[in-house]
Amino acid sequence: MSKTQEFRPLTLPPKLSLSDFNEFIQDIIRIVGSENVEVISSKDQIVDGSYMKPTHTHDPHHVMDQDYFLASAIVAPRNVADVQSIVGLANKFSFPLWPISIGRNSGYGGAAPRVSGSVVLDMGKNMNRVLEVNVEGAYCVVEPGVTYHDLHNYLEANNLRDKLWLDVPDLGGGSVLGNAVERGVGYTPYGDHWMMHSGMEVVLANGELLRTGMGALPDPKRPETMGLKPEDQPWSKIAHLFPYGFGPYIDGLFSQSNMGIVTKIGIWLMPNPRGYQSYLITLPKDGDLKQAVDIIRPLRLGMALQNVPTIRHILLDAAVLGDKRSYSSRTEPLSDEELDKIAKQLNLGRWNFYGALYGPEPIRRVLWETIKDAFSAIPGVKFYFPEDTPENSVLRVRDKTMQGIPTYDELKWIDWLPNGAHLFFSPIAKVSGEDAMMQYAVTKKRCQEAGLDFIGTFTVGMREMHHIVCIVFNKKDLIQKRKVQWLMRTLIDDCAANGWGEYRTHLAFMDQIMETYNWNNSSFLRFNEVLKNAVDPNGIIAPGKSGVWPSQYSHVTWKL
């Protein structure tokens, strides 16, 4: 890539000329090297790719036009100093940056920027080190490019797996750092990934480096006197043991936000529990969801249910095991009779509860007796351990996931339809049978009105449930894509009307969801806007992320 070459990206950021872009990119090349810069100048570069080979140009699961959210270039900093230099240049040009870790972010927009023409800042390509694993404190420190699979392999390669487990989401290829700051979940007792972080290092919009919590306390050896750069200085001994530090707790400002660029994070790991047993409880009837959730609530609050368990709809499990055509020749949403037939064929229930027991055998035995006794109140329930199920069963997959072993089997449900793509609709529900049934009824009805099957799961936290509706669609069917847009927008309004809000969403729906958080004349959004404009006066970091826009961007013009 020549320094004198003129680049012509397919799209430019707002208010920036082609000459501005070229001056900016040439300066970037001088910082990171041409091998770490890719300008998107040809439609041949807009390839959807796959989960294992993710694209960084756009959203591969595009519900809008494929190039609706499109980067002008992809830039991969090599280190913290590069990030700081890039931020400085971006301020000079008011050039929008869209930081990513790995860029998978499946179902929520991938690596695509909210503002087309932004530079996607690929934090994970070069910054991919496991910086520390501390056995005594049971934590690790990682850079953005470390995936769950990378961290698992690191533990195994260093003979640490018998001492420490990590917590993994459904798919093992995501960034440990990225998933935590997006407040993703896993399925061990450490399943709330944001809760399990302690200490972050962040490049602010002015280029300054910040460490949060106890990380703001310098090492008493004063390493800066030894000539170390701030990013290379050792952390306080307790930075990754106590997350809050002193004074205002600011970590949340860098979660699902556009207030800074996270370069390092401390994550708690789970000490090997010295015993483990996964299980499946099948619920035969659709209406059993209500009673099951009411049984789950006291068990989860009392911690008899130790991990983050899931209540999965039959079609989520069925879709892991085969596409829709393998079960039915119909293109319409499947009927209750067909769902019953599939459940019988797969020896599953209409709902299927996956959980795990942790600890020595006497502890597991008492917990299992408690759980089994409680669920036995539901007529027709059945109980399974992995060895009771076929080799390809979902329980065999969840058996790995719930002990922190990364897998990729859950990718298969995206192929439920031809040219499969997906979005997640992710409202929060009370751990209440009545609320679960209401939310299920609303989402299922709207899915069917859009001509789609309901595919979903309830992920049970301590006092709430993430209801993850997996909206699978044919991305080459323009009519179906328009229906999916209608479906998402209608579900957002439906849920807001019932007092339910979403915890995370796709790029295209961030504005609408933020507008539902409108108590007291949207004081929450207005406060975030004040902070955004104060810490990022040029609006360079991820404008529009989570519906928070800097003052340079008109809400009327940019809102979707």
Curated annotation (Swiss-Prot):
Cofactor remark: Binds 1 FAD covalently per subunit.
Cysteines engaged in disulfide bonds, as pairs: none
PTM-bearing positions, type Tele-8alpha-FAD histidine: H422
Catalytic activities: 4-hydroxy-3-methoxy-benzenemethanol + O2 = vanillin + H2O2
Principal location: other
pH dependence of this protein's activity: Optimum pH is about 10.
InterPro entries named in the record: Cytok_DH_C_sf (IPR016170), FAD-bd_oxidored_4_C (IPR004113), FAD-bd_PCMH (IPR016166), FAD-bd_PCMH-like_sf (IPR036318), FAD-bd_PCMH_sub1 (IPR016167), FAD-bd_PCMH_sub2 (IPR016169), FAD-linked_Oxase-like_C (IPR016164), Oxid_FAD_bind_N (IPR006094)
Keyword Disulfide bond: no
Protein name: Vanillyl-alcohol oxidase
Gene giving rise to this polypeptide: VAOA
